[in-house]
């Protein structure tokens, strides 16, 4: 018999239901989590063996949406769900990020979390309940998870913070912030903002963490009610102090010297030489040792050396003080045929960013679970292996690249022009050509310059900075513009982007507990200081958007026609619009409300297309003289075309002031003549005359 264990509670204004014991019972743990009819099935399966030589925690999170959840059938030929969408990948990362740091560093068993959306309320985004359900399932799994964690989405509307706002409210909100953490510590923040102050952001984070306290209490109650599995992984490897001390004695001085080498490439070569030499020596002397044990001890040695140096107030790895930003080089317009381009170099991190302007036909059509939509602003981030001096597979973007592209895109949403004012689809591409930390924020800086170089009228320049943290007990140091090694050996990766007036996006990932509001506040204000310095340097090169778009970009013109005339412009089977596009070399798009967009690389061609459309759609004016072509000759007169789809009759009596016997003696087929409109009757028939012209 199926014996469900159900726990219901209120979370703000929402009803939460956590259930286990009925579905997916073969999994290590499973939870059916619901928030006001948005339901997600969370399953966790863990392996009971490790892969020899495994060096990292192989956690895989797969978030997947089923279209039946929204009462829909998938599009496409196969009519079934395919590879993960960008949104599914982003939410997978959102679930992963607060969970991963809560497993012991030496826990190396493979774990897979699958979150499947099986019912959706169109006003409730499934991401928050997916994090909640994953936290609850992990608490039942018997894995050494140091949770539970909570999750909250915070909006800011009418000067008030809103807990888990609906889809409708979040569209009106000036903030979309997700915060996740344990009872005492925040571990993850993701936010998009409409240029809000540091205090607004900090208060939102604290409000979100405070709000999820009752949620965490209820997950504890649920796990107690469900008789969670005891922790079955008792024999987890712990670092051997004897090995650590031996390695420390042999190479501590050499490692310390290596971390005074300022250039990354030289430093890494020296460190690798030291590591290979000591590893080879120890393995030859002791057959019981493994390379993974040696590597872990070396990691802790490196970590201790770098962290102690910084905490003592000494210079950082590359010789900077804590709040110093690396040397910046800015160049714009470096790609001659590209609509806008910039090369942004910060130390050993470099982004080559291009901006491309397209028409509405280039916009991306998105088939989301919460409804179809069109996106006319795209940001793609590429991280090739050569950027870190490695050989690797080049192919479709990885999760990290998609995540960094999304963060960079969110940095600009508050300053992009309205589609009505600037009717272009905009695509930004950031090629990371060198990387030593903070490449996503270099992409933001480069993108701001590329947009302005392309003549996109953004409201203000945007810059980004990545902050780090070194924390031991109550002592801590916040680092500006972190290197890759400082990210790897440190306790926080805190990316902040914005304008001079405020923050537009941020992403925070914390690896340790004990992060206080004072630490977050200090990081935010230190980031602001760095951001303003970077903006000063950027604005020395390009202060405002260029006054005109590139000569290689399409010119888009917009006109309004009577919606009843749309059929005249399109023609039977699209014949007229096809002829117009071929004749003028333009792209013509017509909306149901009569808005017509004409785009062409050559502005004169676009203007000619406008003239032709106006000729087609303008009403025939009585008494006006038109140039026309004779199309048919009959005994009683001739038909003359005076525009697309507009044909009038000249009666034989209106061809000449004198009496004539035969029309054919005065007019020929395809002859161009001038005619005056005498009348347009109720049926739209046009009567013409050649007299007195």
UniProtKB/Swiss-Prot annotation:
<comment type="similarity">
    <text>Belongs to the polyribonucleotide nucleotidyltransferase family.</text>
</comment>
<dbReference type="InterPro" id="IPR003029">
    <property type="entry name" value="S1_domain"/>
</dbReference>
<dbReference type="InterPro" id="IPR015847">
    <property type="entry name" value="ExoRNase_PH_dom2"/>
</dbReference>
<dbReference type="Pfam" id="PF03725">
    <property type="entry name" value="RNase_PH_C"/>
</dbReference>
<dbReference type="Pfam" id="PF00575">
    <property type="entry name" value="S1"/>
</dbReference>
<keyword id="KW-0479">Metal-binding</keyword>
<feature type="binding site">
    <location>
        <position position="493"/>
    </location>
    <ligand>
        <name>Mg(2+)</name>
    </ligand>
</feature>
<dbReference type="InterPro" id="IPR036612">
    <property type="entry name" value="KH_dom_type_1_sf"/>
</dbReference>
<dbReference type="InterPro" id="IPR012162">
    <property type="entry name" value="PNPase"/>
</dbReference>
<dbReference type="InterPro" id="IPR001247">
    <property type="entry name" value="ExoRNase_PH_dom1"/>
</dbReference>
<dbReference type="InterPro" id="IPR036456">
    <property type="entry name" value="PNPase_PH_RNA-bd_sf"/>
</dbReference>
<comment type="function">
    <text>Involved in mRNA degradation. Catalyzes the phosphorolysis of single-stranded polyribonucleotides processively in the 3'- to 5'-direction.</text>
</comment>
<feature type="domain" description="KH">
    <location>
        <begin position="554"/>
        <end position="613"/>
    </location>
</feature>
<dbReference type="Pfam" id="PF03726">
    <property type="entry name" value="PNPase"/>
</dbReference>
<keyword id="KW-0808">Transferase</keyword>
<keyword id="KW-0548">Nucleotidyltransferase</keyword>
<comment type="subunit">
    <text>Component of the RNA degradosome, which is a multiprotein complex involved in RNA processing and mRNA degradation.</text>
</comment>
<dbReference type="Pfam" id="PF01138">
    <property type="entry name" value="RNase_PH"/>
</dbReference>
<keyword id="KW-0963">Cytoplasm</keyword>
<dbReference type="InterPro" id="IPR004088">
    <property type="entry name" value="KH_dom_type_1"/>
</dbReference>
<dbReference type="GO" id="GO:0005829">
    <property type="term" value="C:cytosol"/>
</dbReference>
<dbReference type="GO" id="GO:0003723">
    <property type="term" value="F:RNA binding"/>
</dbReference>
<keyword id="KW-0460">Magnesium</keyword>
<keyword id="KW-0694">RNA-binding</keyword>
<dbReference type="InterPro" id="IPR004087">
    <property type="entry name" value="KH_dom"/>
</dbReference>
<feature type="domain" description="S1 motif">
    <location>
        <begin position="623"/>
        <end position="691"/>
    </location>
</feature>
<dbReference type="InterPro" id="IPR036345">
    <property type="entry name" value="ExoRNase_PH_dom2_sf"/>
</dbReference>
<dbReference type="InterPro" id="IPR020568">
    <property type="entry name" value="Ribosomal_Su5_D2-typ_SF"/>
</dbReference>
<dbReference type="GO" id="GO:0000287">
    <property type="term" value="F:magnesium ion binding"/>
</dbReference>
<dbReference type="Pfam" id="PF00013">
    <property type="entry name" value="KH_1"/>
</dbReference>
<dbReference type="InterPro" id="IPR027408">
    <property type="entry name" value="PNPase/RNase_PH_dom_sf"/>
</dbReference>
<feature type="binding site">
    <location>
        <position position="487"/>
    </location>
    <ligand>
        <name>Mg(2+)</name>
    </ligand>
</feature>
<dbReference type="GO" id="GO:0000175">
    <property type="term" value="F:3'-5'-RNA exonuclease activity"/>
</dbReference>
<dbReference type="InterPro" id="IPR015848">
    <property type="entry name" value="PNPase_PH_RNA-bd_bac/org-type"/>
</dbReference>
<dbReference type="GO" id="GO:0006396">
    <property type="term" value="P:RNA processing"/>
</dbReference>
<protein>
    <recommendedName>
        <fullName>Polyribonucleotide nucleotidyltransferase</fullName>
        <ecNumber>2.7.7.8</ecNumber>
    </recommendedName>
</protein>
<dbReference type="InterPro" id="IPR012340">
    <property type="entry name" value="NA-bd_OB-fold"/>
</dbReference>
<dbReference type="GO" id="GO:0004654">
    <property type="term" value="F:polyribonucleotide nucleotidyltransferase activity"/>
</dbReference>
<dbReference type="GO" id="GO:0006402">
    <property type="term" value="P:mRNA catabolic process"/>
</dbReference>
